[in-house]
UniProtKB/Swiss-Prot annotation:
Protein name: Fatty acid synthase alpha subunit hexA
Pfam family, one: Ketoacyl-synt_C
NCBIfam families attached to this UniProt entry: pantethn_trn (TIGR00556)
Induction remarks: Expression is positively regulated by the dothistromin-specific transcription factors aflR and aflJ.
Residues the record lists as binding Mg(2+): D1569, S1669
Function statement: Fatty acid synthase alpha subunit; part of the fragmented gene cluster that mediates the biosynthesis of dothistromin (DOTH), a polyketide toxin very similar in structure to the aflatoxin precursor, versicolorin B. The first step of the pathway is the conversion of acetate to norsolorinic acid (NOR) and requires the fatty acid synthase subunits hexA and hexB, as well as the polyketide synthase pksA. PksA combines a hexanoyl starter unit and 7 malonyl-CoA extender units to synthesize the precursor NOR.
Domain Ketosynthase family 3 (KS3): 948-1430
InterPro entries: 4-PPantetheinyl_Trfase_dom, 4-PPantetheinyl_Trfase_dom_sf, Fas_alpha_ACP, FAS_alpha_su_C, FAS_alpha_yeast, FASI_helical, Fungal_FAS, Ketoacyl_synth_AS
Record PTM text: 4'-phosphopantetheine is transferred from CoA to a specific serine of the acyl carrier domain by the C-terminal PPT domain. This modification is essential for activity because fatty acids are bound in thioester linkage to the sulfhydryl of the prosthetic group.
Residues involved in acetyl-CoA binding: 1569-1571, 1615-1625, 1639-1642, 1668-1670
Biological processes annotated in GO: long-chain fatty acid biosynthetic process
Catalysed reactions, as listed in the record: acetyl-CoA + n malonyl-CoA + 2n NADPH + 4n H(+) = a long-chain-acyl-CoA + n CoA + n CO2 + 2n NADP(+); a fatty acyl-[ACP] + malonyl-[ACP] + H(+) = a 3-oxoacyl-[ACP] + holo-[ACP] + CO2; a (3R)-hydroxyacyl-[ACP] + NADP(+) = a 3-oxoacyl-[ACP] + NADPH + H(+)
Gene designation: hexA
């Protein structure tokens, strides 16, 4: 019946035909119903036997030629497999080839292992970097420069490996993204084993072949996957030289019966199905019974184990204390070591600073500083340094800088005499003694004062040999030296050696010395300084993170490091046994420093003050371990390493820090015991077996003032000396110890242990503790008395008022004045007069100048970045601006809860904040959240590198639970997944139930830490465009980079002194300003929204597409701020975009297409871009940097030896470029001159980001150029432009021409601003390029440029990079300060050959910066350079009157702009968005098409608009006259300037009279003309006179005493009237007879004839007023057309 029912349902389509239904009856199928199964029949399966024994090591792979014989043999059906292929370990070659093949997208068998990565990549550096990066992640201990080594030699052939990070991840990704459901890694292994007999290791090898040839898409079925694996296995077999035979399993029934074969795949699938069913049932029961399956079954055992371990830990902690356990934790890591050996660059800095900076002024005033400086130069002497000194000295002789000649001569002598001499430490010890005083306020002060009766070099030696209190020689009392065993007194010899060392110095050249315990201010640190001065290679340890101590040691090395010296700083805990072993092993190991120590100074110590015997605890045990037990361990490790390397003829000298304090002081824990314990080593030399490895010298260190251990006792040092004990300064004791390492004393030490006593007689002092106690009591009593007297005086003064009131010493809190920072104006007499030759060779109208600039970056504005770059910290004003920018404070001017208040308040609490309090309150927050730092998700659109999100594709192995969705969405699922999705409509709704079935592939989000790019130069936290005044409705619509740029451009106008950008159009046409802002990526956030968010089905704005275009940002700038019709050009030069923008604008202005341009670049920091850079290995690996102990602020290290990639940044940089005459006319500040620029591509290649040298073409010329007579530097009567110079052909390079146009040579370049990205390749290529250019152009050797690497503080912002660099160069010229590259802790030794560059690591004040060269490189063969010249050269082209006039106007403009900017900042209105165009719509066309249209300023409101009746703004008569005269002055001869000024004043007076003092009058037209009388000769031409003058005019002229003046004045008047009529000209030769100038009693009158009358009436003129003003050699005619409807007065 059941069967019939089902059959009927199938026929009626109520049930699918393929439904699998089983019918069981209890009478026939009772076992099946009760789940009873028969026991499985045992089948004898013959185990496969490998007849060949497996080799112990991996067999050598056969050559490919042999592999051709390999084959896959199909198995005959009846024959069972009896052999299994031997499993072998993976070889490095297999992994290497797989990784390379995958990157190159080539078959794995086509990769020859005899070639290197570089050869295989065929010049593609990005690909090469990726492969090498994968190798470093995959393997350990790779050789240096693995890209140059053949693949087969990269990893030892005998090394068997497991998969590394990269290969494991690739296999995992292959399985998850390309294999069908349930065909996971385990299934793949089983398949290869069951079918081909491959073991687990060979299966992995097959999968390595698979990752080199992945399927293009996910394989649709298990069968397809098996076919893919079969093909891959065959390729592997071909390479491995093995034969694959398909395996099968056979089962036979007895003789002659039927036989059957069991398919293992089917069996495995059945087993898996049953297991899955059982698991489901188990989980369902667990859920029903509320059993937590995730809870460990052995929870009680785990808890018991935890209790046991905790008890052990508690016992250890109770015995040793947590402090002890923490104190012995190892900290040594060779990765955290820092190396300093760039003594050569420090020498260059010193010499260059001497000749170009203000160093000579300091040295001239301080004889001791001068002597130390000369010693430093002599210790760094070399041929190149001598050549540099001589070259700069010759230049100084020409410039004659006062006081420098003598210093230069002495410096040259010091260097030349020491070139072949090893470095020598000359220690200058001014003998000092302690002095303790008590002030009137009761303050106890300790000072060092000179000792009486001693002076000179040997003063310290004299002190040591002075007589004691009884008048006896005291040498043996203060210091002594004895042989520890024979007790031979060697004191006199040591004293002689001390005198010799003080006089001649000590050399430690070539010595390797380890010093522990050399913290700042310690004896050890001073010993390090002396050793470095003597040329030693010193390894010094620090117990703190290197980042906190590195600056101190870097500065020490720069001050003291001599030639051949080296300082290695490493973190080390001497209390840790492991650190003691690891440090010494690292020094001796060939993979470490590979050095044998000449000396060890285990000076590490810790204070134990205030601890008596009853208080001794775990801390004292820790210190005892550090100062005694660990010293033994460390020395023992030295012995072991020497013996392992058979070093038995070079004992390492050990200077043991002993003490005369054998409990003398008391209360110092186990300090004395530790020192006494070390003394035992003196005897162990004879009683133990290591005398060939170590030479012991005990050093009893006496009372040393100023150390960390003795600080508390310094105030009683004077009392101790009063009792005949000698105390030492830190420098004196360090000298004593260093002297023991001189060759003579080392020889004595090797013969027998020495005991050097520098106790100063302390051990002989009786009752030391009582003396100290009494002295301390006396001092404290004196202080108490002084304080009591002062308090009494204060009370008496308050009561009687008879005593004088104390003067107030509390400083008045300073207010901050926020200023834009306009450039200083040079003094005409001192700075411009010496350059007067430029007045005749340079035309301002053919000059491009920078009149404004701004930036927005990790340090905020350009001003703030400069403070950090040049000084390392913010000023008070800087902190104020930064706090405002980060929304920590806001300005109020109005009523508050505490009354009316004007000033800053806290943004959150509203509490008032004084300017002087800002640093204290917000300084830490500001420093933490600005600059280069860990990426803040808030500042990067939510991107968190610690949780970088990816989509992981998986194949669904089980049907997923149903979920509800709309019918449209459900159909979309079906469209994507087909039959792998089932849809069931929900009755009564439009929704469906959707179930994703087994076999579907889905993507699951996952988060992975992405530490590589987790550091960046982000905008200061809290920055908001709203603070700048951008309307809130625009902020979400625009991409962040557009917001950055709008804010930047607005601020750049303020820096140009322009408070309203529309003012520009008073002077130039709307079309004459260009917008050349560029970007490398454009609106990254909006681009991501358009591509990724649409894919993720997120809501996005409908016009997001427009925000992704690179030119959209420039469009927003124009639409919101300017409304110009000039060109918008959007350069895209990757990281060189900024230079390309400048280059394009320079060409545009010089070709007269524009007169002003906005240039610069903008870019964002974005997740996808950051990941892209990391895959190219271009950016710094943050994880590795942190492992090296680097702080985020240290990770951008241009030119440093340890640099490892650039740090990304974002923001915007802007400049406003302007034609020189426009800048003068407007009275704009001039920050610098753009003298020349270029862009260049590079050679043939395959690598887009590879650094090139195509930019060398900027210096292209045929040998040393010989300038012809028309050159500006040789012919002072010709005016030339940069463009004409650049076209001089092969003899003059564009670079030379750029400088020559301003009378400068290649030697006058002072600064090179480097692209300096902190990548290995760029930072070597760029200096090489610049040095080649300098060599080719003949720059004098020995005159290096200062190399500025700005990215050390900003990171690399891509497109704005060159804009920020240019801003920095302008600030360098104005401040005359060369900023430091503080992160270049050790300049790469490879840059020593770049002799035309000096890399400053400290700021340098210089006397002048004449010119700079800026270089930038971008991916995609974009190279560019810009030459800039100081603004004084531009001003030198002006005569004094013009310059003074300009100075007045620019000063007024600057003050106005400063006030306006401060007001705008405090009111959050820096950006003033234009709501509408400054003209009526109906006037637009004629304004656009009239080149003379100009905007009008409203005198009452200060706003700007185009006057419908006067679109040319001719009504502004005075302004027009001023502009005309100013322009003429620029072109006039110097001797004609005064006459021009006289005529101008007369014309201005007439205009004042006519206009009543108003700037505008009700006029229709104005005409102005100027005639230079010295150039006027037309009156001699009869034809000219006949055509242009009426009979009356000719008669008047001929009756005049000066006919030339008469005709010239009438001609100027005619021209002015003609301009006033605004009629269309008939050409230059048109007659002017229709305009007649009639003599009148008061002023000349105008009489028009014929067509001119019509023109006047057409212009709506009722009258034309005329003035002719005379100067000495010129005259000015002004014609004003008066509008009106009355009878025309000009018809007479």
């Amino acid at each position: 019946m059941g069967q019939k029912t089902i059959k009927r349902k199938i026929q009626s389509a109520e049930r699918p035909a393929e439904a699998d239904v089983a019918f069981l009856a209890s009478t026939q199928h009772s076992k099946d119903l009760c789940y009873e199964y028969d026991a499985p029949e045992e089948v004898a399966v013959e185990e496969p036997v490998d007849e060949t024994p497996a080799p112990e090591t991996a067999p050598e792979r056969p050559p490919l030629s042999r592999a051709k014989t390999a084959a896959v043999k199909p198995q005959e059906t009846a024959a069972p497999t009896t052999a299994t292929i031997a499993d072998v370990p993976l070889s490095a070659e297999e992994i290497v080839r797989a990784l390379v093949a995958r990157k190159l997208k080539k078959p794995i068998l086509s990769i020859p292992t005899s070639k290197s990565v570089k050869e295989l990549c065929n010049g593609k550096s990005t690909l090469q970097n990726e492969i090498v990066g994968d190798f470093h992640s995959e393997f350990t201990n790779l050789p240096d420069r693995p890209e140059d080594i053949p693949l087969k030699e990269l990893v030892p052939a005998s090394q068997s490996l497991m998969l590394g990070r990269v290969s494991s991840a690739l296999l995992s990704k292959l399985v998850s993204s390309k294999m069908p459901a349930r065909f996971n890694a385990d299934a793949i292994g089983k398949y290869l084993a069951s079918k081909w007999g491959l073991g687990p290791l060979r299966s992995v090898a097959v999968m390595l072949f698979a990752i080199a040839a992945e399927p293009e898409a996910r394989l649709g079925s298990v069968a397809a996957a098996e076919k893919y694996l079969d093909d891959t296995a065959a390729k592997y077999a071909e390479w491995a030289g093995i034969t694959l035979q398909e395996r099968s399993t056979q089962s036979s029934a007895g003789g002659g019966g039927s036989s059957g074969t069991v398919d293992p795949t089917v069996l495995a699938e059945l087993t898996k199905t049953n297991t899955r069913l059982a698991k489901r049932q188990f989980q369902a029961l667990a859920e029903y019974l509320q059993v937590d399956l995730m809870k460990p079954s052995s929870e009680q055992e785990s808890e018991a184990l935890a209790v046991e371990l905790q008890q052990k830990l508690d016992a250890w902690t109770a015995e040793f204390s947590e402090e002890f356990l923490a104190g012995v934790a190892p900290t040594f890591s060779e990765k955290k070591s820092r190396r300093y050996n760039a003594w050569w660059n420090a020498a260059r800095q010193d010499v260059l600073a001497l000749f170009s900076g203000n160093l000579q002024e300091d040295l001239s005033r301080d004889a001791a500083a001068l002597e130390a400086f000369l010693d430093r130069l002599s210790n760094r002497a070399g041929e190149s340094l001598l050549a540099m000194t001589r070259s700069l000295s010759r230049r100084n002789q020409a410039n004659a800088i006062p006081g420098l000649t003598d210093i230069a001569r002495r410096a040259e002598k010091a260097i030349s005499s020491c070139i072949d001499r090893p470095a020598t430490a000359k220690v200058h010890l001014p003998a000092t003694r302690p002095r303790t005083t008590v002030s009137d306020e009761g303050d106890i002060k300790f000072n060092e004062v000179p000792r009486p009766d001693v002076s000179g070099h040997a003063a310290y030696a004299d002190v040591l040999q002075a007589k004691d209190l009884n008048g006896h020689p005291a040498a043996a009392r203060f210091v002594s030296l004895k042989s520890a065993h024979s007790h031979t007194d060697l004191t006199n010899g040591m004293l002689d050696r001390i005198r010799t060392a003080l006089d001649s110095g000590m050399s430690f050249a070539g010595k390797n010395i380890l010093i522990t315990g050399a913290g700042q201010g310690s004896i050890g640190a001073e010993v390090v300084r002396i050793l470095l001065t003597g040329g030693a290679r010193v390894i010094v340890t620090t117990s703190r993170e290197p980042s906190s101590t590195a600056k101190y040691f870097q500065q020490m090395y720069e001050e003291s490091g001599a030639k051949g010296s080296e300082l290695i700083l490493t973190r080390f805990n001497q209390a840790s046994a492991k650190d003691c072993e690891n440090l010494v092993d690292h020094i001796y190991d060939s993979s470490g420093l590979d050095r044998d120590l000449d000396a060890v100074l285990p000076f590490a110590a810790a204070p134990e003050g205030g601890t008596e015997i009853q208080d001794v605890g775990a801390k004292n045990e820790l210190v005892h371990r550090l100062m005694l037990a660990s010293v033994f361990r460390m020395l023992g490790r030295v012995i072991k390493n020497k013996r392992d390397r058979s070093i038995d003829c070079h004992p390492t000298q050990v200077l043991l820090p002993l003490s005369p304090n054998h409990g003398t002081f008391g209360g110092d824990g186990m300090y004395a015991e530790s020192k006494l314990g070390l003394e035992s080593l003196v005897n162990r030399v004879q009683s133990e077996s290591w005398s060939d490895e170590l030479a012991i010298c005990g050093v009893k260190i006496g009372w040393t003032r100023g150390t960390g251990l003795m600080n508390a006792n310094d105030i009683v040092a004077e009392a101790i000396e009063d009792h005949g004990v000698l105390t030492f300064s830190v420098q004196e004791m360090a000298f004593n110890i260093a002297m023991l390492m001189t060759p003579e004393l080392v020889d004595l030490c090797e013969n027998a242990p020495l005991m050097a006593d520098f106790g100063g007689g302390l051990s002989a002092l009786e009752d030391c503790a009582k003396i100290l106690s009494a002295a301390r009591t006396e001092i404290n009593t004196a202080a108490d008395v002084a304080r009591a007297v002062k308090a009494e005086d204060d009370l008496e003064r308050a009561a009687s008022r008879t005593l004088p009131a104390p003067s107030s010493t509390s400083p008045v809190a300073k207010k901050s004045m926020l200023r834009i920072g306009f450039p200083r104006l040079p003094d005409f007499e001192l700075e411009l007069s010496p350059l007067e030759h430029l007045r005749d060779i340079k035309d301002p109208s053919e000059t491009v100048v920078v009149v404004g600039f701004s930036e927005l970056g990790p340090w905020g504005s350009a001003r703030l970045r400069w403070e950090i770059e040049s000084k390392g910290d913010f000023s008070q004003v800087g902190y104020m601006e930064m706090a405002w920018m980060m929304d920590l404070i806001k300005h109020v001017d109005g009523p508050t809860k505490n009354g009316y208040y004007v000033g800053w308040v806290d943004s959150k609490t509203g509490e008032s904040v004084h300017d002087a309090e800002i640093e204290a309150r917000y300084g830490e927050v500001i420093r933490k959240h600005s600059g280069i730092r860990f990426v803040d998700p808030e500042g990067s659109a939510g991107y968190d590198p610690s949780k970088k999100e990816y989509l992981h594709e998986v194949a669904v192995e089980e049907d997923l639970p149903e979920f509800e969705a709309s019918s449209a969405t459900a159909e979309a699922f079906r469209l994507r997944h087909g039959t792998n999705v089932s849809i069931s409509p929900i009755e009564g709704t439009e929704n469906c139930r959707v179930q994703v079935k087994r076999g579907a592939s889905i993507k699951i989000p996952k988060s992975v830490p992405f530490t590589w790019g987790s550091v960046a130069g982000q905008l200061p936290k809290g920055w908001s465009p709203k603070k700048y005044g951008i309307p809130e409705d625009l902020i979400p619509q625009l991409d962040p980079v557009s917001l950055y740029t709008i804010c930047c451009v607005a601020e750049a106008f303020y820096s140009a002194g322009i408070t309203d950008p529309l003012e520009i159009f008073k002077y130039i046409h709307l079309s004459e300003i260009g917008n050349f802002l560029g970007s490398s990526m454009g609106g990254a956030l909006k681009t991501r929204q358009m591509y990724r968010d649409i894919y993720l089905d997120k809501d996005i704005q409908s016009d997001v597409l427009q925000e992704t275009y690179l030119n959209t940002t420039g469009a927003w700038v124009n639409m919101l701020l300017l409304g110009s019709t000039g060109p918008i050009k959007t350069p895209m030069g990757a990281c060189a975009t900024g230079v390309e923008s400048i280059d394009s604008a320079f060409e545009s202005i010089m070709s007269d297409k524009t007169r002003m341009c906005i240039v610069g670049g903008f870019d964002d920091f974005h997740e996808d871009e950051s990941y892209g850079f990391s895959t190219m290995k271009a950016t710094v690996n943050v994880e590795e940097e942190l492992a090296k102990g680097r702080l985020p602020s240290e990770m951008s290290r241009p030119t440093a030896e340890s640099r490892s990639g650039f740090v990304e940044a974002h923001g915007c940089g802007v400049q406003i470029l302007c034609r020189g005459d426009v800048a003068l006319e407007m009275g704009l500040p001039v920050y610098g001159i753009i003298a020349g620029s270029t862009m260049a591509a590079d050679k043939v290649g395959r690598s887009v980001p590879a650094p090139g040298q195509g930019i060398l073409t900027f210096a292209r010329e045929t040998g040393q150029a010989q300038l012809d007579k028309s050159s500006p530097s040789t012919n002072t009567t010709s005016r030339t432009s940069s463009v004409s110079l650049a076209r001089r052909g092969a003899t003059v390079s564009p670079l030379r021409a750029s400088l020559d146009a301003w009378g400068l040579t290649i030697d006058d370049l002072d600064v090179a601003s480097l692209h300096g990205t902190s990548t290995k390749a760029n930072d070597l290529n760029e200096p090489e390029v610049i040095c080649k250019q300098m060599d080719h152009l003949g720059r004098t050797p020995g005159r290096p440029l200062w190399a500025i690497c700005q990215k050390s503080v900003t990171g690399h912002p891509k497109a704005p990079a060159a804009a920020w660099m240019l801003n920095g160069c302008l600030q360098v010229m104005d401040s005359r300060t060369i900023p430091a590259n503080r992160n270049a802790d050790n300049v790469d030794p490879a840059l020593q050959t770049a002799t035309h560059l000096c890399f400053p690591t400290r700021p340098v004040r210089v006397q002048d910066v004449r010119a700079f060269i800026l270089t930038s490189f971008g991916f995609g063969q974009k190279g560019g350079q810009v030459v800039g010249v100081a603004p004084k050269y531009f001003f030198a082209t002006l005569d004094e009157e013009v310059y003074k006039d300009y100075s007045v106007r620019v000063t007024k403009r600057s003050k106005t702009a400063d006030r306006a900017y401060a007001k705008a900042l405090m009111s959050n209105a820096i950006v003033k968005v234009q709501d509408h165009s400054p003209y009526e719509q109906e006037d637009q066309s004629r304004i656009f098409m009239d080149p003379l249209s100009r905007i009008t300023e409203d005198a009452e409101t200060g706003s700007y608009h185009f006057d419908t009746k006067d679109i040319r703004n001719v009504a502004d008569v005075k302004a027009r006259l001023t502009r005309l005269v100013r322009g003429e002055r620029l072109n006039a001869r110097p001797d004609a300037a005064s006459g021009l000024a006289q005529a101008a004043r007369s014309a201005q007076a007439w205009i004042e009279k006519q206009t009543g003092g108003r700037s505008s009058v009700d006029t229709s037209t104005v005409g102005i003309d100027l005639v230079d009388l010295s150039a006027f000769s037309a009156h001699e031409n009869e034809t000219f006179i006949e055509r242009n003058f009426t009979e009356q005019e000719k008669a008047f002229a001929k009756q005049s005493l000066d006919q030339k003046m008469a005709f010239a004045s009438r001609w100027a008047a005619k021209e002015a009237v003609f301009k006033c009529l605004h009629t269309q000209t008939k050409g230059a030769g048109a007659a002017m007879k229709d305009i007649e100038i009639v003599k009148s009693d008061n002023a000349p009158k105008v009489k028009l004839h014929n067509d001119c009358i019509k023109a006047g009436r057409k212009a709506g003129l009722e009258d034309i007023q005329l003035s002719i003003s005379h100067g000495e050699d010129c005259l000015i005619a002004v014609a004003i057309g008066i509008a009106g409807n009355g009878p025309a007065k000009y018809t007479l």
